[in-house]
């Protein structure tokens, strides 16, 4: 009887303690004209890192916003904070291959496919993805969550 009473609290602790692997919510709203603000996004494979809002009404998430132009002529946007680190001062950096790399933990993420999955490293969850709306007529891009 006493042995069961000793085991019960341990079992309860093991079952109730559950780590959540989610990215914290931060507001995101970024709107800009590609020709004026980010001409590097005109070409497929181009990317732009926004680490600060362009004006007072815009928000760039936790670590900033990475916008990538895929070879399928689609735009994808991700938070630049590494999901493993989840700190604003540790940012991912993209390369022309469509891979974002965290300098702190070494995790690598594939952004060119629009999913942000982990390629290698310590990270367990993909990048935080944001919705992208593109107006070809106005050449404007809107990123929001």
Which sequence ranges carry the predicted segments?
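Sec-dependent bacterial lipoprotein signal peptides
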Residues: 1-17
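Short cysteine/histidine-rich metal-coordination sites, predominantly Zn2+-binding motifs
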Residues: 96-106, 116-130
